[in-house]
From Swiss-Prot:
GO molecular-function terms, A-Z: transmembrane transporter binding
Compartmental location: Cell membrane
Source organism, top-level taxon: Eukaryota
Biological source species: Homo sapiens (Human)
Record-given protein name: TRPM8 channel-associated factor 1
Domain notes: The C-terminal region is necessary for the channel activity stimulation.
Keywords of the record: Cell membrane, Membrane, Transport
Amino acid sequence: MATPSAAFEALMNGVTSWDVPEDAVPCELLLIGEASFPVMVNDMGQVLIAASSYGRGRLVVVSHEDYLVEAQLTPFLLNAVGWLCSSPGAPIGVHPSLAPLAKILEGSGVDAKVEPEVKDSLGVYCIDAYNETMTEKLVKFMKCGGGLLIGGQAWDWANQGEDERVLFTFPGNLVTSVAGIYFTDNKGDTSFFKVSKKMPKIPVLVSCEDDLSDDREELLHGISELDISNSDCFPSQLLVHGALAFPLGLDSYHGCVIAAARYGRGRVVVTGHKVLFTVGKLGPFLLNAVRWLDGGRRGKVVVQTELRTLSGLLAVGGIDTSIEPNLTSDASVYCFEPVSEVGVKELQEFVAEGGGLFVGAQAWWWAFKNPGVSPLARFPGNLLLNPFGISITSQSLNPGPFRTPKAGIRTYHFRSTLAEFQVIMGRKRGNVEKGWLAKLGPDGAAFLQIPAEEIPAYMSVHRLLRKLLSRYRLPVATRENPVINDCCRGAMLSLATGLAHSGSDLSLLVPEIEDMYSSPYLRPSESPITVEVNCTNPGTRYCWMSTGLYIPGRQIIEVSLPEAAASADLKIQIGCHTDDLTRASKLFRGPLVINRCCLDKPTKSITCLWGGLLYIIVPQNSKLGSVPVTVKGAVHAPYYKLGETTLEEWKRRIQENPGPWGELATDNIILTVPTANLRTLENPEPLLRLWDEVMQAVARLGAEPFPLRLPQRIVADVQISVGWMHAGYPIMCHLESVQELINEKLIRTKGLWGPVHELGRNQQRQEWEFPPHTTEATCNLWCVYVHETVLGIPRSRANIALWPPVREKRVRIYLSKGPNVKNWNAWTALETYLQLQEAFGWEPFIRLFTEYRNQTNLPTENVDKMNLWVKMFSHQVQKNLAPFFEAWAWPIQKEVATSLAYLPEWKENIMKLYLLTQMPH
């Protein structure tokens, strides 16, 4: 099938003017999906002629039937039937309602005849948009390779009828909508037409809210909220971007968990996780959804085999289902989870021709397993759903009640908010609902990840954003001059990042001021730089490999590597500041400042608006060894590796390497801090040897092999997403913590509580964690262990919270209220473990963590996990610890207590003393 660009050129070849009949008032056309494109657009941005494809056939739609019998438009009409006819020489059929068109075509040497019915032998069929008897025949004709030229307007038809839902009842729409083109009841302006040399843009917004309000009401009938609080799942956030798509459940940040859409003659409902098909509280909504998807046909409802629980929920509401592995030819509604690319086209045609699709899927796990690959572009569910105007993102939502849109109250939608943003940017005034611009930025950045090449519906948004952002200088967010997120400047930061990552010309994105990270201040080397990168990864997850290179902001770089490495699933990443700040109220930097992409070609170009250190992401179990990586457009950054970098090399790098961020590395820990801080470090070796001792202790307590298979990373940033520091890969901290990381004297005297707390968080395992009680507790075991065994700082001095009088008071307060595991959290929970450690030492913990690593099929519920811990620790120390844990109000099961009764009593149990001396409550 020809590309839309080539098709547009063919349709416009030789057309120099639009001499349309003055008395023919057209209607505006609405374009959705990935195949439709505009041909004629007036100066108001309204599409009046459009084209598309469906199946093996093609479609041209004009917004008034009189245009098809206007001799002045002969050049265009000839182009249209020529492009529509896939079989050269095949006759053109013209419906009697357009008889003058046959004469126009015949007068130009085209074999055209008046035909009351469409026939398979025809190459093209021309008809007005009011015929109600040939709908199925026309769709089949087009699907099988025929060309359809259709014209009409719906505003007058709407004025004469009782049904106001023109998009779904106008006869022409029952045909053209399968290819993504709708006649609307909006009158088209005819005061000025321009013959476009290149394909015009599709407008961001065509008003059709009235056509969708009944759908929303039917789906949410009797439902005030969508409560998934007890679903035990984190659904993906949905991006609702289609003109006929609408949200049904929103959180306080306008994050969408369930959405619906019209597409062609069919309907779609999407949930952000398949588990939502099993949530009992959603039962009324699930019933509403299936009935709406069925559209009153009372047809067959097919449920994918893996989702059989949904079948039971629907049966309670009186809906019979058929459990099948795949879609069946007689289905009216199909409920399933998309897990592969197989059958995408068939499913899209199923919907376009009237079917109902109920989809449940999340993309965050797929995104985790495929770093550097956008789920908007490659996740199987989105290959199916993107044309419907709903996409599943990698952002997760917290389970909880989601509000539903209320009639008469405006609800956030990407397209309507983008249209308002466009108005404000043009007029420099206007208001948008609270929180909408903060949501527009990340939504726009996500939308820009959808592959847009030769897809006019997406490219039009790209073009609009390029135009808007090129008019104004890009805000520069700093701590001294933060940018408010929920405003146009905040939205610009996210949208500009998305544009840059989509490959747009970065020269259009000029900052308000040049900062030290921008290319004018960091001149990249004119010659390519080649570095050897260790691409062996024995770990169980991907890892970042440092290159010692920095990419200036707004720089396009070219990365080259050997052919063999280009097929090894390597990725490239610019930047290490991975925190997503899209929900921050104020921004001290861009909300998303890294860029990742696959190194799937020997030579690859990549851009990053903000710049950053350059990394190669190596997949787990990679055995590539050393790989030469050549980069054009980079500068050197300070980098020190313990055992490899000499002191002379370090001093030279600090003086000569201009990168504003640098790294200190061992085989077990990598610290990323500003170069300005590194310049105060004359010799990193003593510091890093101390850090290696710390990491060895961390590994020893956690029963991990040392050296670590995957070095931990700590990255300093001007702003992070949560807390003073937070765990993860990498661990993130504020710039104020840099001295705590790189000042050896300070570490030895004051300690390392914050960083080791996060290293401890990374050591926690769900098998022996009891969230939320121990989330901020057990990680501090590593703090105590490191401070006492490596730094020689006793626990009472390492943290004021562990001063003995404070500890005793905490326990007594816990007991005085009546011991209850609901109140057993954080420091109180840590006390339980410290009492055990002070009695039995560290070795039982180390042996226990080793035992946990070697076991499989461990329980997942807190009560069962806590009882297993009691049993295993009791066996480690050969004491019956059930009474000790009962004193702490752990839910000890009777059979566990009985099974431990044979062990000796723990006579030194300190909780006995507390209980004996506790005042009655």
